[in-house]
Amino acid sequence: MSQSIEDYLERIYLFIKENNRPIKTTELAKLLNIKPSAVTNMAKKLHRLGYVNYEPYIGITLTEKGIEEAKKILDKHKTIKIFLVEFLGLDEKTASEEACKLEHALSDEILERLKIFMEKFKDKV
């Protein structure tokens, strides 16, 4: 999955969770700092891939598949951020920015190993 798709799913999920309604393409464009037409194109692509439901003038919602992927991305972000703060001593803001970069490159296998490492050594930090 591309970094761009992951960013869209993450932003859509967080918006819907916070606002309890579909996100409009103009709102998502503003959040991602891109043109609404680019969001519309990606919404159509995400719909074809089965991640979102997209209805013009109503907005974008996540399918079960989209929710599952978004939660995995957010879990990855959270795990990396905790590691960076608790194990490497980064401040929250820097850790969040770095986690956003790293979450796209980290495989599921490495994420699981990182979780095991953190659990094993959490009392030694």
UniProtKB/Swiss-Prot annotation:
Q: Which SMART domains match?
A: HTH_DTXR
InterPro entries named in the record:
DtxR_MntR_Metal-Reg (IPR050536), Fe_dep_repressor (IPR001367), Fe_dep_repressor_sf (IPR036421), HTH_DTXR (IPR022687), Iron_dep_repressor (IPR022689), WH-like_DNA-bd_sf (IPR036388), WH_DNA-bd_sf (IPR036390)
- SUPFAM superfamilies given in the database record: Winged helix' DNA-binding domain
- Every copy of the HTH dtxR-type domain together lies at 1-63
Q: Give UniProt keywords alphabetically.
A: DNA-binding, Transcription, Transcription regulation
**UniProt keyword annotation of Transcription present:** yes
- Which molecular function GO terms apply here? DNA binding; DNA-binding transcription factor activity; protein dimerization activity; transition metal ion binding
Q: Which Pfam families match?
A: Fe_dep_repr_C (PF02742), Fe_dep_repress (PF01325)
Q: Which family does it belong to?
A: Belongs to the DtxR/MntR family.
**Can you name this protein?**
Uncharacterized HTH-type transcriptional regulator MJ0568
